[in-house]
Amino acid sequence: MHHPVILLLCLSSLAGAANLPPEDLSQPVTADVIVPTGGTAILKCTVQEHLESSLQWSNTAQQTLYFGEKRALRDNRIQLVHSSPNELTISISNVVLSDEGEYTCSIFTMPVRTAKAVVTVLGVPQKPQVSGFESAFKENDKAKLRCTTSGSKPAANIKWYKGPEELEGAKTSVLEDGNGKTFTVKSFIEFDVTKDDDGAEITCAVGHESLHDSAKSSSHKIQVQYKPTAKIESRPSMPREGDKLRLQCDAYGNPVPDNYVWERENGEVPLLANIEGNSLVFFNLNKTDSGTYTCKASNTLGTFITHYKLDVNDPSPIPSTSSIDHAVIGGVVAVIAFLLFCLLIVLGRYLIRHKGTYLTHEAKGSDDAPDADTAIINAEGGQGGSDDKKEYFI
């Protein structure tokens, strides 16, 4: 039922399309350009049908820059990139803010056809300058810092960081520069400082579209002065009577603590103890040195007091000389006994192997000496002699 309506709409659309003017193939085509100061702008103009005419580029003051491949304006920053009947491309190097505006590409047909290309020049912000670090902060002070950058177009944005952490709450002001084109941006930040901020890096980062996702920044490390803290360490940790002991007071602060005072609760510091810088030294500990000792560490901002309870233990037991001597003697006796035992074994084996072949001086001196000599001769003569052999023993 709706088919006639749909058909009518389709016919109407076709009729409207038929009434559109045909595409002008001789119309030049250009594109807008955005370039930062100091950069290079590329101006490209193309045409499908040149109709035997040349393309021409003109600047914002309608001065001809190039007509075809012929240079018309003496400006070495402007160079020919490509020239053909269907294209004319030129470049402008070291772009400045005054180069901004509308550039015209023309083709001298009948009628003359033109196309505009808008060149936008970005003002690159300068490296930011940060103030407020002229002197050190004191703990719990409020830091007030300012960051300034000039020459940006459009106006730059500024962010603050403490280490990797972004600081919130900054206030920003934007002022137009004297040239009427660029801007100066100022950012102010305030925050309370603690001793943990001593040495922290504060960064002012400037962001701008001319910086291509990077940022110009300035960083400074802040100094925070604070009262000292301290603790006492014992060396050795388990002191005994007769030891040398060093009680060392390790203090931290800004400025560095430079004054140390040692005291003893309910008494005087022993006369034989020496104060060496931040240390109290006992050269020969005594039981009477036990007690609570106090170290007062000071800098220009204040004093910190820390305590240490000293308990002197009994001297280490020393083994007696007599017990050492007994052990040595016992060891020597054991060695000698072992050697004698070995000697007896060797001697016994020797006697067994030479049984019946011994002749003593006493035997030689007796009445049976000739028989003893004969026994020796028979023994040396082997088994070939008589079976009757005499043996002489002591």
From Swiss-Prot:
Ranges of the Extracellular topological domain: 18-326
TM segment ranges: 327-347
Disulfide bonds: C45-C105, C147-C204, C249-C295
Limits of the Ig-like C2-type domain: 128-223, 228-306
Record localization: Cell membrane; Cell junction
Gene Ontology terms: biological process: homophilic cell adhesion via plasma membrane adhesion molecules
Pfam families: C2-set_2, Ig_3, V-set
Native species: Xenopus laevis (African clawed frog)
Family, as annotated: Belongs to the nectin family.
Keyword annotations: Cell adhesion, Cell junction, Cell membrane, Disulfide bond, Immunoglobulin domain, Membrane, Repeat, Signal, Transmembrane, Transmembrane helix
Primary localization: membrane
Coiled coil ranges: none
Cellular component terms (Gene Ontology): anchoring junction; presynaptic membrane
Region (Disordered): 217-240, 363-394
Protein name: Cell adhesion molecule 3
Family annotation (Gene3D superfamilies): Immunoglobulins
Cytoplasmic-facing ranges: 348-394
